[in-house]
Design a protein with these regions (language model features):
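Beta->alpha loop/short-helix hinge microenvironment recognizer with preference
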Residues: 1-294
Length: 294
C-alpha cells in the first residue's frame, strides 16, 4: 500500500457516528458500504470546492474499524488524506486547511441520505431525531498531521493491520475468565474488565468481517492512475520498491523452505529494516541494516 502514496504531508482524520446509528450497521453489515461512500463523497467534495474547474483530487486511504477500546460494536473510519491534490491543469496544489465544520455537516448529511435510501421510509423518524440532537454534525476529528515519510509509513503499519485487541492488553486467563484492560476514551482512565471466556470470544467474533468485504479502500489519486500522477513524487522511490519487494520474497522463501525467519533475532525479537542504501543505476549495491525492535 505504501507504494501508492505520494511524498506529501498527510492528515489522519477519524469519522464517527452517534450511538443510535450503530445498531443499523450491526443488523445489516452491507450498510458499512454507506459509511465508506459518505466519507469518500465528503472528502472529494471538500477538495473540489477549492476550484471546480481544476477539480483537485487528493489521495486518501480509508480503514474501517468496527471496535471501540472496550471491544463494543462501534464502527468508524480512519482516513489518511494527502495535504494536497492533483488538478486537471495544476499538477499539485498544497491544501493545509481542512474545514471541519464542513466535514462534520457534510458527512452527516450524506450518510443519513444514503441510509434512508437503503433502509427506506422507516428511517425518516430516526433521521429527523438525529438532525435535532446532532445540530453540529457527526464528530470528525483530526490527529496531528504526518509531516514526513517515516510518520506516514509508521501510521500505515499501526492502523492497517490493527487487531481488535492487542495481546498486551490481555492481563490474565485462568481457563474460565479473561481479564483485559483499556483506557476509557472519555477521560483516558485505565479500566480493567473480567469476563467469561465465552463472552470474550463473543466480543471478538462480532468484528470478523463478511467474506470478501474490503476493510481498507483507496480513493482519489490512490484509487487509480491520475493523468498527472507521473508528475508527482512517490513516497517510496522505484529503486527502493524493487529492493523491498525482493526482500519480502527472500524472507518468505526462506521461511517456507527451511522453516526459519531470517530477521528473527536470537533474543526472540523481530528485527526491522532501518535504511536501504542504493548506489548507482541500476541497483548494484545495497546495505541492509537491521536492529532489534526490543
Amino acid at each position: 500500500m505504501s507504494f501508492k502514496l505520494v511524498s506529501s504531508p498527510h492528515r489522519h482524520c477519524v469519522f464517527t457516528i452517534p450511538q443510535e446509528l450503530r445498531i443499523f450497521f450491526r443488523k445489516d453489515r452491507n450498510l458499512l458500504n454507506c459509511l465508506f461512500d459518505a466519507v469518500r463523497q465528503t472528502i472529494l467534495y471538500m477538495f473540489r470546492k477549492i476550484n471546480k474547474a481544476e477539480n483537485f483530487t487528493p489521495g486518501f486511504v480509508c480503514v474501517l474499524h468496527t471496535f471501540g477500546r472496550s471491544l463494543q460494536w462501534n464502527p468508524h473510519i480512519h482516513v489518511l488524506i494527502s495535504e494536497g491534490g492533483a488538478g486537471n491543469i495544476t499538477p499539485w496544489r498544497v491544501v493545509k486547511h481542512f474545514n471541519f465544520n464542513f466535514l462534520r455537516n457534510s458527512f452527516q448529511m450524506l450518510l443519513l441520505k444514503l441510509l434512508e435510501q437503503q433502509i427506506g421510509p422507516s428511517f425518516k423518524k430516526i433521521k429527523a431525531s438525529i438532525y435535532k440532537n446532532q445540530e453540529n454534525g457527526f464528530y470528525v476529528y483530526a490527529k496531528p498531521n504526518l509531516t514526513n515519510n517515516k510518520s506516514v509509513l509508521d501510521y500505515i503499519g499501526r492502523y492497517l493491520g490493527r487487531p481488535v485487541i492487542a495481546s498486551s492488553r490481555i492481563d490474565k486467563y485462568d481457563g474460565n475468565f479473561v481479564t483485559f484492560h483499556y483506557n476509557r476514551h472519555e477521560d483516558e482512565k485505565l479500566i480493567s474488565e473480567t469476563v467469561s471466556a465465552w463472552n470474550f470470544i463473543k466480543k471478538l467474533i462480532i468484528h470478523i468481517p463478511e467474506k470478501h468485504f474490503k476493510m481498507i479502500r483507496y480513493y482519489g489519486i490512490y484509487a487509480k492512475k491520475h493523468k498527472n500522477s507521473h508528475k508527482l513524487f512517490p513516497l517510496i522511490k522505484k529503486e527502493k520498491r524493487r529492493f523491498l519487494a525482493s526482500l519480502n520474497a527472500w524472507k518468505t522463501s526462506l521461511f517456507f523452505s527451511f522453516g526459519c525467519d531470517p530477521i528473527k533475532c536470537t533474543c526472540g525479537h523481530t528485527m526491522s529494516v532501518l535504511e536501504i542504501f542504493l548506489k548507482g543505476s541500476p541497483l548494484i549495491h545495497s546495505i541492509r541494516k537491521f536492529t532489534s525492535s526490543a
